[in-house]
Amino acid sequence: IGLNYISGMILNTCFATKATLPIAKLYSLIRIEDDLIESSSYFYKEVDEIKKIIADTGNEFNSILLLDELFKGTNTIERIASAKSVLSYLEKQKSHVFVSTHDIELTTMLDDQFALFHFTESVVKSTIHFDYKLKKGILEQGNAIRILEIKNFPKEIVESAKKIVCEMK
């Protein structure tokens, strides 16, 4: 999305049959890393970047926000609560928000505010293949345990994980 936006605006070319691109500021929050030299944790750096985005959105310019797994540097409950609150806020601004998440709870909380899409995969001969085609709606089945299985994790771990998932649903 980001590369298509940039190439569309600069080169008047993008990978699309048709594109209508708004004049907007593009923000990407995808590859944040800990910085041991500056004693800055992943979470603190992410919070600082999100705060900059919040301060910059809602002004006279539209914004396109590309966000990946918000607040993944903290515990599950606070991550989901914080991400839901930030995304709900950004959605009210002049923003086009694109966010990726593995948090099923977050997707159900945002279902009435955002158009939800997902990717699926198939397993062929113990190899996982992604088609990278967006499908509407919430992903119904995860793939983490299946990947553990494909990577030949001990059966005890795989079965235990499956059991825990069933108990948590």
Language model features: what each stretch is:
Residues 1-169:
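ATPase nucleotide-binding head domains, primarily ABC-like/P-loop NTPase cores
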